[in-house]
Amino acid sequence: MAVRSRRPWVSVALGLVLGFTAASWLIAPRVAELSEKRRRGSSLCSYYGRSATGPRADAQQLLPQPQSRPRLEQSPPPASHELPGPQQPEAAPGGPSFRSSPWQQPALLPQRRRGHTPEGATALPGAPAAKGEPEEEDGGAADPRKGGRPGSSHNGSGDGGAAVPTSGPGDFLYVGVMTAQKYLGSRALAAQRTWARFIPGRVEFFSSQQSPSAALGQPPPPLPVIALPGVDDSYPPQKKSFMMIKYMHDHYLDKYEWFMRADDDVYIKGDKLEEFLRSLNSSKPLYLGQTGLGNTEELGKLGLEPGENFCMGGPGMIFSREVLRRMVPHIGECLREMYTTHEDVEVGRCVRRFGGTQCVWSYEMQQLFHENYEHNRKGYIQDLHNSKIHAAITLHPNKRPAYQYRLHNYMLSRKISELRYRTIQLHRESALMSKLSNSEVSKEDQQLGRTPSFNHFQPRERNEVMEWEFLTGKLLYSAAENQPPRQSINSILRSALDDTVLQVMEMINENAKSRGRLIDFKEIQYGYRRVDPMHGVEYILDLLLLYKRHKGRKLTVPVRRHAYLQQPFSKPFFREVEELDVNRLVESINSGTQSFSVISNSLKILSSLQEAKDIGGHNEKKVHILVPLVGRYDIFLRFMENFESTCLIPKQNVKLVIILFSRDAGQESIKHIELIQEYQSRYPSAEMMLIPMKGEFSRGLGLEMASSQFDNDTLLLFCDVDLIFRGDFLQRCRDNTVQGQQVYYPIIFSQYDPKVTHMRNPPTEGDFVFSKETGFWRDYGYGITCIYKSDLLGAGGFDTSIQGWGLEDVDLYNKVILSGLRPFRSQEVGVVHIFHPVHCDPNLDPKQYKMCLGSKASTFASTMQLAELWLEKHLGVRDNRTLS
């Protein structure tokens, strides 16, 4: 009886199971068809649905697809927000029942499992479409890219509880760059060549529907450009921004975890951005960027309620995959209901309304997504030596390609410094492990792996002690021979100090958040600096800091700290400007009779060294020596004797050009002309040229007139009659002057008055004696110059309005710097400025007269010698120690 009583219940249960099964087979397809019709009810954005590239087997194996029927479209939205597109034809029988997209789809993702029902409009529960508006077109069940998975709650936990696959470095981030057709060859190309290469994913540029460069008839630049149909380059780019976001959603939603909308004038640090995003969960609805509320004039006019915000478009907006999944189906409604002309405000409103989130409220976002708020900003970030620049992930703006390349160059230089510092750390670890394992430490580890210390070098004599330079925030005090005792800190040292202090502050504030305090740098009170040639640069800095405590009782107090720092040198690197053809070089060496070879075991470089008399032969670049002159026949006679021994007898490849100024009838120039004719008759093959000029002496005018006689590839040497030089100087003039790049400005050794300096111990070595007693390096003079004619013209030439002595060389030097040429300055041991009495004309320009008096005072003797002479004359004290 008990068994029989159970049979009716078993029959009822079996009937329910069969009934539900039949309903799923008979009713579910009809429900899916009705849902499909409702999804097509919207006329907005339907043109931008997913594409159907023909009937696909994997699409047809899912559910039976109803045929598309003609239907009445809704009344179109206002023209200002309508997305135009051609009317789509009906789908072929048996084919997919959705409209085709004008974009070409990427490769299909793996087919979904049989039995999964297609996702509808992917509208969120609790965030439906507006009342009276049908849901946006989804693209149907045939498109697997939508990511439709039944049972997905869209609450940030992923797809129906399934684990989100971990993305690799190539499919992590998708960056869409908004640009315009006119910027494809400039801003967009600069972005592609700089930061876009370091993005862990894909970067594409979005422009208008018009093909790139079509109007110019030129091929488009090598950029991955997406032409958005129905979108133009008008500003504000609201439509372009929303359609770009929809393109990301339709094509790459399941391929990338994060999506970024960027401007073409932003700079993105790909490595820092990846590190930041890897720490977040892309399955949650996250909307990242610099939080904005509008400027002062726009407060209350953007349609934002209290507590609402948006992410500013300039530094970039970042969307998680879940935000796009929720928001994009409602983009049509967002476009129809806009309250402002700011596309970033409207995107933020759409995310907040349908994505279930808004731009994160975080103070750090203002630092990570950097917007330049400098006063009178010029379209670029001027100060790069800044902790804010180093901490930022995105930097905006860089309006010109040159600004983008400048910033990228700075970032690469910082990367190089970081890698070199890492090599130093590895050498230290290697040296430590060798010591702990009682093994021999390599020489490279011994040199580069030393711990920081000021005692690496131990002097054994008094003159081996390395002296420190004293510095303040603005001034440098030095005891070096070739430097003034007090000078302003130059730009190179200033940049080095700024970088050093910046690194120190980053080290101090490394754990500032956990410690609950922040320390800001105020200024350098004073400090010391020296360079150890074997180990690095050493600093002792007294820093004024500002201590800020933000945990517990808030406190802000100034503090002073001493910092003992060392910047160690890393391994040197060598680069060949021109690749060395070893086989050809060996043949030339073996065939030569006056050359020999040296093989360097460390560098493996085979080089040829020739005898000195072969240097500067006729196969070298010809040097045109230009000498302006007025009177001073005896000095000119000495110059020609030196020119004969240095150039004429060894047959140097040079040409001498004398610019001879004469007053009155030119009677004083007869001797000069006869002397030149005598040398021409003595050396017929030598090239010498005389350019006579009348009027007051003007060095700039004479050199400008003489240089105009030659073509642009001529190497010019601006010389003075007071100089004597050797052949090695001419070779360095050739080597250190690079056409279009570099100008050689040798620092000349100038003799003191021999009546003062040699009154007790006259020299026997000749004029090329370099010591404190015989002369000084004329580091303030720029008159002796090696430059190409084309570079002289490019810099602007001499100021021919300057009359008399001085200033024309300083003016040209400034022009060379401003023209972008690189001045090469160094002490030149092959040239000596022979002493001559200086006469300063009181009728000179006041600035020229002051410079002339300063030059005259510096030529008498050294400070120590003048002091001895004064003591001997006035006090009868005689001390020969300084002259010994």
From Swiss-Prot:
Gene3D superfamilies noted in UniProt: 3.90.550.50, Spore Coat Polysaccharide Biosynthesis Protein SpsA, Chain A
Chief location category: Golgi
UniProt biased composition (Low complexity): 60-69, 84-96
Cytoplasmic side: 1-7
An individual GO BP term: chondroitin sulfate proteoglycan biosynthetic process
Subcellular location: Golgi apparatus, Golgi stack membrane
Protein name (Swiss-Prot/TrEMBL): Chondroitin sulfate synthase 3
Gene, per the UniProt record: Chsy3
